[in-house]
Amino acid sequence: MNITKAFCLSIALLGASNMQAITNSDFVIQQDNTKINNYQTNRPEASKRLFVSQAVEQQIAHIKQLLTNVRLAWMFENCFPNTLDTTVHFDGKDDTFVYTGDIHAMWLRDSGAQVWPYVQLANKDAKLKKMLAGVIKRQFKCINIDPYANAF
């Protein structure tokens, strides 16, 4: 018998000799103390949101009606509009900048990925459509400056 097998066998036997019988009385089901009964929005106040889309707000209301899990509905309400609320800088012109985080080398990829969930709603909201076009135009503008760069 090689050393590895002998070692594994001795560990298994040692563990088996120290095992105690487990009975149902060893387990107590406790009430979940992490349950939140009153879910509050974590979104910025409406006046402090960087971009507001009526189509996105309507989509949030629609999805929340479909979800039966209150916590999941709360998470969707807070997460889905987060990019618009906190990272999109659009001043009505054909130029939109999206804050993408700390990896500047991935701006082209991340700026597109962050606004991608809203593309499906673009035809329902002219302002949203213009903002999305602004992201694309900003990307083209940056690529024209340096086609081999990926961070601007």
Question: Which residue stretches match the model-derived regions?
Answer:
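A generic secondary-structure boundary signal that marks alpha-helix termini
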Residues: 85, 123-124, 141
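Residue-level detector of alpha-helical secondary structure
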Residues: 75-79, 113, 117, 138
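Structural helix-adjacent loops and short alpha-helical linkers that scaffold large soluble proteins
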Residues: 65-72, 121-133
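Well-ordered alpha-helical segments within folded domains of soluble proteins
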Residues: 107-120, 129-133
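Helix-terminus loop motifs that line ligand-binding clefts
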Residues: 127-152
